[in-house]
């Protein structure tokens, strides 16, 4: 037992210059954990509620002093004296204190900050690395980095509809080698963009945001960059997409995509064409978050060939994930801690996915900080996949550097997930 001595929150800035919540939890033995809460740009309608001030006189209404007050005035008095090793009890106490079904009274950003900082403090008190404290002795799988090297959609001011174009160095022998491969392709792409007279400016997640003619143009550029860096597409490095289709859904079952009005069925046919042309192993949010029938059709058509990831569809919520599993919708869940608001509920979603035969992908948000908790969580859960942006921008690199440290600490017991994370892909 190690009791909580103090809980303190403050307002800091994220990678977009937008306020977010940082929390410090100190235990009676002096152990201190700190956590900063991320925030998304394209957010699912069913995510837990992020409490903001709505005061247009400060930070354009995006301040988080109300969430900070929730921590310092309401949560802290309830948790002082609580056993930090009882993560489940701690999280449930905050959920009960909030009293809503989406954490809208205290704010999911307030509750999550305390949840993560408490776990960090407890790990220090136990003299364990965070990944080991959270996952136990079996935690040793280093995830495949899903590197977002071209940004479109809501993450960039360009005409490209698809939000993220990712490279996955699945053929590497270790995480450190996969990171090197990804960096080499990233820099190869930068040279190629400049030689083509295209912008090499960066989007929110560190990927390039050039003005391109089409989504296929982006994919072709990436394949060329992979080859020029000395790697083989489909063998060394494969591709993944985050479509973020809810961003261009205009009505149920209807989308505005590449300048045309199309139906769910037409969009599904488009994806089938991509699968036949490119080494794609994963497609995230290919349809609107409410298009369950479309998702069922999509999963029936291509679910045996590609990972179909639900982000806005599932929002790290076990109720929505359970519906998806029972309905045969998608086959993977994107896991974002701030979508649900506590560490316990996040791990519940990962566990449910595994039991249902679904994969899980640990993910950052477009508004990030130097906090590296998700890197530890990826190893703790042995999920085998992580999305944390391009190999650029300090808040993204922080997660990659933490994974390098974890791999070094694990030594010979470390295992890189590689191809094992994508058993459905048939192009090997």
Curated annotation (Swiss-Prot):
GO terms for molecular function: magnesium ion binding; phosphopyruvate hydratase activity. Binds a second Mg(2+) ion via substrate during catalysis. Pathway: Carbohydrate degradation; glycolysis; pyruvate from D-glyceraldehyde 3-phosphate: step 4/5. It is an enzyme of class 4 (lyase). Disulfide bonds: none annotated. One of its GO terms (biological process) is glycolytic process. Mg(2+) binds at residues 242, 284, 311. (2R)-2-phosphoglycerate binds at residues 163, 336, 365-366, 387. It comes from the Bacteria. It is found in: Cytoplasm; Secreted; Cell surface. The active site is at residues 205, 336. It catalyses: (2R)-2-phosphoglycerate = phosphoenolpyruvate + H2O. Belongs to the enolase family. This is Enolase. It comes from Tropheryma whipplei (strain Twist).
């Amino acid at each position: 037992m190690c009791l909580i001595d103090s809980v303190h929150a403050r307002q800091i800035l994220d990678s977009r210059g937008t306020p977010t919540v940082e929390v410090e939890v100190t235990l009676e033995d002096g152990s201190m954990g700190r956590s900063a809460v991320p925030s998304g740009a394209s957010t699912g309608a069913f995510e837990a509620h992020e409490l903001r001030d709505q005061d247009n006189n400060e930070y354009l209404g995006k301040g988080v002093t109300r969430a900070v007050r929730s921590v310092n005035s309401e949560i802290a008095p309830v948790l002082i004296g609580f056993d930090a090793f009882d993560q489940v009890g701690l999280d449930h106490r905050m959920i009960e204190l909030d009293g809503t079904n989406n954490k809208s009274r205290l704010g999911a950003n307030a509750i999550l900050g305390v949840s993560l900082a408490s776990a960090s403090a407890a790990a220090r008190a136990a003299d364990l690395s965070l990944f080991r404290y959270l996952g136990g002795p079996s935690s040793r799988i280093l995830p495949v980095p899903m590197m977002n090297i071209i940004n479109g959609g809501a993450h960039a001011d360009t005409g490209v509809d698809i939000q993220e174009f990712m490279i996955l160095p699945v053929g590497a022998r270790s995480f450190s080698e996969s990171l090197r491969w990804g960096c080499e392709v990233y820099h190869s792409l930068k040279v190629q963009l400049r030689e083509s007279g295209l912008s090499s400016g960066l989007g929110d997640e560190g990927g390039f945001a050039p003005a391109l003619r089409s989504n296929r143009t982006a994919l072709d550029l990436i394949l060329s960059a992979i080859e020029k860096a000395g790697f083989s597409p489909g063998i060394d490095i494969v591709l993944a997409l985050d479509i973020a289709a809810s961003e261009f859904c205009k009505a149920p079952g209807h989308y505005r995509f590449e300048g045309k009005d199309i139906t769910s069925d037409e969009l599904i046919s488009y994806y089938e064409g991509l699968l036949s042309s490119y080494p794609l192993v994963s497609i995230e949010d290919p349809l609107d978050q409410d298009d369950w029938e479309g998702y069922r059709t999509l999963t029936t058509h291509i679910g045996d060939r590609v990972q179909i990831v639900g982000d806005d569809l599932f929002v790290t919520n076990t109720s929505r994930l359970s519906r998806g599993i029972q309905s045969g919708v998608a086959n993977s869940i994107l896991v974002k801690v701030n979508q649900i608001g506590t560490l316990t509920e996040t791990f519940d979603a990962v566990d449910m996915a595994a039991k249902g035969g679904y994969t899980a992908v640990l993910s950052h948000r477009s508004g990030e900080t130097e906090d590296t908790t998700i890197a530890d969580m990826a190893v703790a859960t042995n999920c085998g996949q992580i999305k944390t942006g391009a190999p650029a921008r300090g808040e993204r690199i922080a997660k990659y550097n933490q994974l390098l440290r974890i791999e070094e600490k694990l030594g010979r017991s470390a295992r890189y997930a590689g191809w094992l994370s994508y058993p459905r892909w048939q192009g090997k």
